[in-house]
Amino acid sequence: AEFGGGVKVGLNLTLADGNLVVASGHGIDFSATSGSGTSELLDDYEEGTFTPALSHNGGSSVSIAVGAATGTYVKVGRLVTVTFNLNVTPSYSSAPTYWLIQGFPFAVNVGIGSILGYNNNNAASFAGRTETGGNNALFFATLASGTAANTFWTASYETDS
């Protein structure tokens, strides 16, 4: 059945089978709550995969051999959370100033996102931040030249996409 004026349900709405489909440009309205936010409309949800990459700033004769590079993401509204694995072996004659993780699935809105990582090969932890306007994050850490780093990461950031 199709109703042009809307349907009001007094108690609960249960779908016995199938999906709840919301038309493009609309979402779930939480305005009945007493929050003071600027938007109470949940209008975006997405999950998927991406391929992260490692780059650098500074240093000399830097090269990066990449083994595994796999990532997943969940986007709810403007908040993106990524988790990924990078298995890399950097080589250099002088160390880079910092390392860049690139290839995030959505552009970073503001530089307030954070990233945490762990090197499974030597139990080292990393922390960093996202970069405004790009699809990347930077971190300051020592990745030993010629030594494999099997790293695991998670990051959360805001996007306008």
Question: For the regions a protein language model found, what residue spans apply to each?
Answer:
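Generic beta-strand structural signal
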Residues: L15, K75, T130-T132
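Intrinsic low-complexity, repeat-rich intrinsically disordered segments enriched
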Residues: A1-G59, T83, P90, Y118
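Extracellular attachment/recognition segments
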Residues: G103-F140
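Beta-strand-connecting loop/turn residues
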Residues: G18, H26, R78, N135-N136
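Residue-level detector of buried hydrophobic side-chain packing
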Residues: V80-V82, F104, A155
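Short, structured beta-strand segments at or near domain termini in extracellular proteins/domains
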Residues: A149-S161
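Surface-exposed ligand/attachment interfaces on beta-rich extracellular proteins
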Residues: A32-L41, T49-V76, N85-V108, T142-A149
